[in-house]
């Protein structure tokens, strides 16, 4: 496994599956970010999985791996859990800048085209990357939450108690990426919450709206007034408890 990052998707798409497969003895997987140039390292490998590689140096590395592949016979799989072509990344997304260079689009496209398989998270992305890259060997592997991350917080009695306590004012929680908010006001708040912000404002006394890690800037006044509950970003270890 070659990771693109050590943040959220790096864990639940690469690191945690690798850990569990190794722990259960289902596979012997090594992971990291270093491009290993020793051909002997790849002897006996069945699969090399690369996550969201996009730079010219990474393309050259994959091309070199293709020459080693002829000798060793392993598969090369490209893992991607998001859209990385800039024409389809919203202007409000704070990470868009990382993919604005046309060369990034070209190199990531070429890498995906020469890989034996692409893995994605859902059918929409499967059809998207088939259409964009022409590589028809795209497999859907949904995101799965590992039990060791969340299971100790599942308590049926507590769930029933919470329901009784909050049923007069149900809690509605958003705990996704802050990239869905126009935090730099690039498009005048026309982000992923633009179409529901008015509903949230109008129902703030009917529902307890809860945001984790970020919130629509146009609702800042409700956050400051404590009418919307807000919890700051947290690390992956403490995230379930937060």
Give the positions of each predicted feature.
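N-terminal pre-catalytic "stem/leader" segment of glycosyltransferase-like enzymes
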Residues: 1-55
